């Protein structure tokens, strides 16, 4: 058991340290250097002045990655907020109200989840004009279904418990039951899913930008930087390796953090298996 806590604490420390470093670095770089073209400094090698060198327009790669983190992480957070608001709200009503509302939502989710979500995202993103804001819409229209299904499942398991029956018996308003009694039961599982999905959404945003459906030049964004670096993989591989490494490390950190949170949640519920 001690090993489990040690692992979780280490992962949490790495997670917090990563976020802290990203935030602090924002104050030491200029967004102007991320987009300003300087053709006299194209393909500069790695140095103290340019920690990762420069690209084909003379822009500092390190600065672009740090500023790109602002774009990627902000859009990811915004997308998650939209997903949670829509998904949890529908899940609460579907699980509590039952009847035709639940059946309609479940049938829609069954159809939506039967198709690979990334394919649908590509179709939706292609329908809109390429931009980061339209990626928020495209991803939200797909990812809310997982949160609705999870929320409904938890609500269903709580509906037959005495505290809900007593609240209904004393005619406690539905809004009060949903917000004060059921929502706290949902929050831990939703937080775990959010942390795990954070990495997935970063991957979706980067992938869609890589194929030209997200951020457009000269906006510094990790996926768009991958697309740009692809053309120089032989002559200047750092242009591809740097953003790819940042994406991979970020996704790994959030996935490990999500796993650690899930383990702790299961332990608190008394469901954790010591042999895990």
UniProtKB/Swiss-Prot annotation:
GO terms for cellular component: plasma membrane. Disruption phenotype: Deletion of the nikBCDE operon strongly reduces nickel transport and urease activity. Mutant shows decreased virulence in a mouse model of ascending UTI. Insertion mutant shows attenuated growth in several infection models. GO terms for biological process: nickel cation transport. It is found in: Cell membrane. It is a multi-pass membrane protein. Residues 69-258 form the ABC transmembrane type-1 domain. Keywords: Cell membrane, Ion transport, Membrane, Nickel, Nickel transport, Transmembrane, Transmembrane helix, Transport. Part of the ABC transporter complex NikABCDE (Opp2) involved in nickel import. Probably responsible for the translocation of the substrate across the membrane. Required for full urease activity and plays a significant role in the virulence of S.aureus during urinary tract infection (UTI). Belongs to the binding-protein-dependent transport system permease family. OppBC subfamily. This is Nickel import system permease protein NikC.
């Amino acid at each position: 058991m001690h090993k489990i806590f040690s692992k979780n604490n280490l992962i949490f420390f790495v997670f917090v340290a990563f976020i802290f470093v990203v935030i602090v670095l924002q104050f030491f770089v200029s967004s102007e250097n991320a987009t300003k073209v300087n053709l006299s400094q194209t393909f500069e090698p790695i140095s103290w002045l340019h920690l990762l060198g420069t690209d084909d327009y003379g822009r500092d790669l390190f600065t672009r990655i740090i500023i790109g983190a602002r774009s990627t992480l902000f859009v990811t957070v915004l997308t998650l907020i939209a997903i949670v608001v829509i998904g949890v709200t529908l899940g609460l009503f579907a699980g509590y109200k039952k009847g035709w509302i639940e059946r309609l939502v479940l049938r829609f989710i069954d159809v939506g989840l039967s198709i690979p979500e990334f394919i649908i995202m590509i179709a939706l993103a292609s329908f809109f004009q390429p931009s980061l804001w339209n990626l928020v819409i495209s991803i939200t229209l797909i990812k809310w279904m997982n949160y609705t299904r999870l929320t409904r499942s938890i609500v269903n398991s709580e509906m037959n418990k005495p505290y809900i029956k007593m609240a209904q018996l004393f005619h406690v308003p539905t809004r009060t039951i949903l917000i004060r009694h059921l929502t706290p039961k949902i929050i831990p599982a939703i937080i775990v899913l959010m942390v795990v999905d954070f990495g997935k959404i970063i991957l979706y945003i980067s992938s869609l930008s890589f194929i030209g459906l997200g951020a457009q030049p000269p906006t510094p964004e990790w996926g768009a930087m991958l697309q740009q670096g692809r053309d120089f993989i032989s002559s200047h591989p750092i242009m591809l390796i740097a953003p790819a490494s940042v994406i991979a490390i970020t996704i790994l950190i959030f996935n490990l953090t999500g796993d650690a949170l899930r383990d702790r949640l299961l332990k608190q519920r008394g469901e954790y298996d010591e042999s895990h």
